[in-house]
Structure formats: structure tokens, C-alpha cells
Amino acid sequence: MKKNIHPNYGKARVSCVCGETFETGSTKKELRVEICSKCHPFYTGSQRMIETGGRAERFRKKYGLAK
């Protein structure tokens, strides 16, 4: 392998919007995620829907247009 072309790989702190934090390996120091294993419906057993909303949904909501 060539030297000095690979990014530095080290510990990274991952924080979720639910408040959960944990450490993993990454080329970045800090990662922020919307869903983790503590709040994902598959792992929790709940069937709640999480709306993240994209540009199209915000446009439809703003102008009162149907899907």
C-alpha cells in the first residue's frame, strides 16, 4: 500500500437525536444520526413512523397540495 494517501482511521463518537451516544471507528471524529438501534422500530418492536420530510413534502404542505 502507498504511504500517506489513506485517511486516518480512529475512534468516533456517534450521537443520535434520541440522545443515545456510542463509539465506533471512522475517519471522522463525530457523527450525528437520526435513527439508531435504541430508537429504530425494528429493534424496539414499536411501529411508530418517523417523518423526516423532504423538499417535495415541505412544498406540498406549504401550498396545500395533495400527494
UniProtKB/Swiss-Prot annotation:
Protein's job: Binds the 23S rRNA.
Source organism of this protein record: Pelotomaculum thermopropionicum (strain DSM 13744 / JCM 10971 / SI)
Single GO term (MF): structural constituent of ribosome
Cofactor section: Zn(2+)
The protein's name in its UniProt record: Large ribosomal subunit protein bL31
A GO cellular-component term linked to this record: ribosome
Lineage: Bacteria, Bacillati, Bacillota, Clostridia, Eubacteriales
Binding site for Zn(2+): 16, 18, 36, 39
Pfam families xrefs: Ribosomal_L31
Family assignment from sequence similarity: Belongs to the bacterial ribosomal protein bL31 family. Type A subfamily.
